[in-house]
């Protein structure tokens, strides 16, 4: 699929991002009675804390209300930097091209913040409220 191709009216790259950071079929795990660490928020700090603790053998729960990656991946740092990088020195850049580029960059790095990566690392990921 191409970056501009639509899936149910949504750009393909947005759909790919969603599949990684909030998979529609994902089921929250049955909570353990006790965790060594409960992390609230799957932004950059929460992701590092949870995967590091799990790597050291801790029972870790990661709770995210919105999307894995937090504002940095989904709304803030990554999208704004990608838009700036694309348009810098490109006087012919269009809104459509810039946003297509931003979606491509965001989707290409989302696997680092994916639910599956953290589940595979031993983190109990809880999505929603």
Please provide the spans of the model-predicted regions.
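Glycine-rich flavin
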Residues: 1-35, 51-58, 63-129
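Glycine-rich Rossmann-fold phosphate-binding loop(s) that bind the pyrophosphate
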Residues: 41-44, 65-66
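Residues forming the Rossmann-fold NAD(P)(H) cofactor-binding site
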Residues: 47
């Amino acid at each position: 699929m191409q970056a501009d191709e639509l899936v149910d009216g949504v750009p393909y790259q947005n759909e790919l991002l969603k599949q990684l950071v909030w998979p529609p079929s994902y089921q929250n795990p049955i909570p353990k009675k006790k965790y060594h660490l409960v992390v609230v928020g799957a932004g950059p700090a929460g992701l590092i804390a949870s995967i590091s603790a799990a790597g050291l053998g801790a029972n870790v729960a990661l709770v995210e209300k919105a999307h894995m990656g937090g504002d940095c991946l989904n709304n803030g740092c990554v999208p704004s930097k990608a838009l700036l990088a694309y348009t810098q020195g490109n006087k012919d850049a269009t809104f459509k091209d810039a946003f297509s580029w931003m979606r491509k960059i965001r989707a290409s790095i989302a696997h680092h913040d994916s639910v599956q990566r953290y589940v595979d690392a031993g983190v109990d990921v809880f999505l929603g409220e």
